[in-house]
């Protein structure tokens, strides 16, 4: 049994997929398997993988036949096939930096069930020195509360014990919102290394925003689930620090409910947010709830642009 399973979910990216796999093969950490989970690609993905398999029997190819097509179902397919004690995911359009896996696994061997680091952003072919993960500035242990309070955000790269997930999987009804599964990674000791381990490629800066808008109801479901997780934590721990974040998640659920034109869910989540903690964003959204969606999206883009400047 390999120590580490590297899962590479893929769909119609045969050229970039080969680069991703080779970046794994070039790692100095060798006790691993490479699980390629193909979401029924229509290009030559399978042939690319088969050619690489000729010289490396650690590479395994699995067609996603048991889950719905889509990022979450494809990742679940990969998880089902992983046999390593530890697991990590590498997107098919990303690459690992030299020494990434050995550094993370060395820290894991010190008794950490979850170790993660940062990524370098590559925008439209230009590699920058900018980290994709925000909020963490030094090597440190990370608690479940840090995660739930959203003290850090963005793209990171991690290795974790597969046992932390037990039999839990990504919810196929959600669009994104992986945090509903990642919360399980903080059951045991977690450690963050303030260093880049992966190249995170962004081809269109607005692609995530556009995707979220087109799948607004599924994004709403994810935020609603996150809010419920926070509310349960608040109820169990009596820690008032959770109130602000919990209210914020209900507000985000309300925002996407509006984009999905589900007004019953919109007002239910807004009033839930305000009942937990009176907050300006929820009040503003309540006022804006009568404004058409296309205007809300334009105002949101203006706000993001102003925050960057």
Curated annotation (Swiss-Prot):
Q: Name one GO cellular component term.
A: membrane
- Report a single Gene Ontology molecular function: glucosyltransferase activity
CDD domains with a match to the protein in the record? Glyco_tranf_GTA_type (cd00761)
Q: How does it sit in the membrane?
A: Single-pass membrane protein
Biological process (GO) annotations held by this record are: protein N-linked glycosylation via asparagine
Q: Where in the cell is it found?
A: Membrane
Task: Identify the PANTHER family for this entry.
Answer: GLYCOSYLTRANSFERASE, UDP-GLCNAC:BETAGAL BETA-1,3-N-ACETYLGLUCOSAMINYLTRANSFERASE-LIKE PROTEIN 1
Functional summary from the UniProt entry: Glucosyltransferase that adds he final branching glucose to complete the final heptasaccharide structure in the N-linked protein glycosylation pathway.
Give the similarity note: Belongs to the glycosyltransferase 2 family.
Protein name, please?
Answer: GalNAc(5)-diNAcBac-PP-undecaprenol beta-1,3-glucosyltransferase
State the organism named in the record.
Campylobacter jejuni subsp. jejuni serotype O:2 (strain ATCC 700819 / NCTC 11168)
